[in-house]
């Protein structure tokens, strides 16, 4: 039984890390797009 709980906990941690990585990638893409637009929009 402890092995099952350990695998469940490990899967939950892996899923949380994957979700966090996905959110970080999405935020980076949005921020990079906004940064690129603001850079190209500047007159100088």
From Swiss-Prot:
The entry's keywords: Early protein, Host membrane, Membrane, Oncogene
GO BP terms, alphabetized: symbiont-mediated transformation of host cell
Keyword Membrane listed: yes
Region (Cellular DNA synthesis induction): 32-44
InterPro entries attached to this UniProt entry: EPV_E5
Membrane topology, as annotated: Peripheral membrane protein
Location(s) in or outside the cell: Host membrane
Pfam family, one: EPV_E5
Predominant location category: host cell
GO cellular component terms listed in the entry, alphabetical order: host cell membrane; membrane
Family affiliation: Belongs to the papillomaviridae E5 protein family.
Chain's role: E5 can induce cellular DNA synthesis. It seems to interact with a 16 kDa cellular protein. E5 seems to activate the PDGF receptor.
Subunit (UniProt): Dimer or monomer.
Protein name: Protein E5
């Amino acid at each position: 039984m402890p092995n099952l709980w350990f695998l469940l906990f490990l899967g939950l941690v892996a899923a949380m890390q994957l979700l966090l990585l996905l959110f970080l990638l999405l935020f980076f893409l949005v921020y990079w797009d906004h940064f690129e637009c603001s850079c190209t929009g500047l007159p100088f």
